[in-house]
Curated annotation (Swiss-Prot):
This is D-amino-acid oxidase. It comes from Macaca fascicularis (Crab-eating macaque). FAD binds at residues 8-11, 37-38, 43-45, 49-50, 163-164, 182, 283, 312-313, 315-317. Phosphorylated in the cerebellum; probably not by PRKACA, PRKCA or PRKCE. May be S-nitrosylated, which partially inactivates the enzyme. D-dopa binds at residues 53, 283, 313. Residues 216-228 are annotated as: Active site lid that may open upon substrate/product migration in and out of the active site and close to increase the hydrophobicity of the active site, to make the hydride transfer reaction more efficient.
Length: 347
């Protein structure tokens, strides 16, 4: 069975690993290749702070909440693993801040120790009148992609830097299954009017005294369009830009100033922080994730395509649940082709 995964961000690599983990023992040979024109450190995943938090509003597809929870539980089970540091995985506590009371999020029982802020805590943030405190996880994209790449390489997965122009091109080369994890660029391979870039820009600073995440929310300006501060292992990520439909990959000085002024107002000690890096990336925004099978007719035969893209700004938050779901779709393909029994249901 020849499988080609297109895309080498967190969605592509985790899906490749999940398929191999689930089926390599029951399907011989299982040949997996990863095609991408960008690998770490040049992917969208590399720009992300890696903070686990779904959107505040419930997803239109209820399965997405399950996939996010599966990802949190999977990561939490690795938090004391000797590999946690290599994954860029650690616990972090902090604040979500609002100007008025809002309902608790559906994921409040997934994270650890969720509670409302006390009046004394709110005194620390005079611009805000309501908030939550909880402990969540950070999975730093750059570390995690490197770790996934090493695990896949150990398993014999091959990587090829190439720009794929069409599914037909890959199918004609002999792929039995194509896994489409091309993120914001999925529309190049197949038109998708629902998919848009959600441009983000972030500043990374050296500020080791910042120990808590701080996310602010402005309902009128939409998700990710107000200041946020997220500490990592080496640097602190500052953000607050979300521009739907903007394909400009260059850093913008106006956006830089918006981020810097907003974050320094939130945490004045940042004014003394040294800027280490500044990056721009595109969140693959879609009303709901596209995670489904499609049959592609190429010449006399059919090639199976599994689509797994459109994860917006929460790819690291939901990636493992989506990888498991994609692996189940792969298993159904094998069943239909009478190539394998389904793996045990402990997934």
């Amino acid at each position: 069975m020849r499988v080609v995964v297109i895309g080498a961000g967190v969605i592509g690599l985790s899906t490749a690993l999940c398929i191999h983990e689930c089926y390599h023992s029951v399907l011989q040979p299982l040949d997996i290749k990863v095609y991408a024109d960008r690998f770490t450190p040049l992917t969208t995943t590399d720009v992300a702070a890696g903070f686990w938090q779904p959107y505040l509003s419930d997803p239109s597809n209820p399965k997405e909440a399950d996939w996010s929870q599966q990802t949190f539980d999977y990561l939490l089970s690795h938090i004391h693993s000797p590999n946690a540091e290599k994954l860029g995985l650690f616990l972090i506590s902090g604040y979500n801040l609002f100007h008025e009371a809002i309902p608790d999020p559906s994921w409040k029982d997934t994270v650890l120790g969720f509670r409302k802020l006390t009046p004394r805590e709110l005194d620390i943030f005079p611009d805000y009148s309501y908030g939550w405190f909880h402990t969540s996880l950070i999975l730093e994209g750059k570390n995690y992609l490197q770790w996934l790449t090493e695990r896949l390489t150990e398993r014999g997965v091959k990587f090829f830097q190439r720009k794929v122009e069409s599914f037909e091109e890959v199918a004609r080369e002999g792929a039995d299954v194509i896994v489409n994890c091309t993120g914001v660029w999925a529309g190049v391979l197949q038109p998708d009017p629902l998919l848009q870039p959600g441009r983000g820009q972030i500043i990374k600073v050296d500020a080791p005294w910042i120990k808590h995440f701080i996310l602010t929310h402005e309902p009128e300006s939409g998700i990710y369009n107000s200041p946020y501060i997220i500490p990592g292992t080496q640097t602190v990520t500052l953000g607050g830009i979300f521009q739907l439909g903007n394909w400009n990959e260059l850093n913008n000085i106006q956006d830089h100033n918006t981020i810097w002024e907003g974050c320094c107002r939130l945490e004045p000690t940042l004014k003394n922080a040294r800027i280490v890096d500044e990056r721009t990336g595109f969140r693959p925004v879609r009303p709901k994730i596209r995670l489904e099978r499609e049959q592609l007719r190429v010449g006399p035969s059919n090639t199976e395509v599994i689509h797994n893209y459109g994860h917006g700004g929460y790819g690291l938050t939901i990636h493992w649940g989506c990888a498991l779901e994609a692996a189940k779709l792969f298993g159904r393909i094998l069943e239909e082709k009478k190539l394998s029994k389904m793996p045990p249901s402990h997934l």
